[in-house]
Amino acid sequence: MAEQPGKALVPEIRFSGFTDPWEQRKLDEVASKRIEKNTNEIKETFTNSAEHGIVSQLDYFDHDITNDANIGNYSVVYPDDFVYNPRISTIAPCGPINRNKLGRNGVMSPLYTVFSVDDVINKLYLEYYFKTNSWHQFMFLEGNSGARSDRFSISDSTFFEMPIQCPVLEEQELIASFFNRLDSLITLHQRKYCGVASWMLGVALVRLGSESDGAFGEMKHVLR
């Protein structure tokens, strides 16, 4: 992002047809914190993984670590809501922010910050924005790791002061679409690579089996 006279935000590389500077808005100008608490009507608990995004707790832990007695104070999460998890890791040094793409309601621990976004910002654009480290500097300046070394500490009021770089909606949509297609292409090639790698491993085991006895010899018959 190049900074022009007057501190206008103008990206050095952008789609053709767009010349206006990007705006910098605070998160609370485009999003609102969810304050709705569960009334024990929603039974499914979600978790926010830095690697896998928002997933059902049953899928992530192989069992539900909550029960009806302790989820009454949990926050309700709706489809397309965003969730900040203060748990830090190597790939999420100040905690991950992910979007609920499960297509259903759930509840999450009150340790998480849940927020919905307005129509002034494209949800997919914001999702990719939070996959970058553009917002990390603000977090490191305004928050800290707290008493627990695995938790990032920042107040809600400060969190929602986070600056967000916002082009016009049409440009947001193009940026989001571009990265979405890129992700799909990467996934496709990863699957092809895994398929080729598995085939090569099979060939190697068969060749080894033809040259020796024992387990590799038995493997040859399994792979046929």
State the predicted function of each range.
Residues 1-224:
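Feature detects amphipathic, helix-rich regulatory segments
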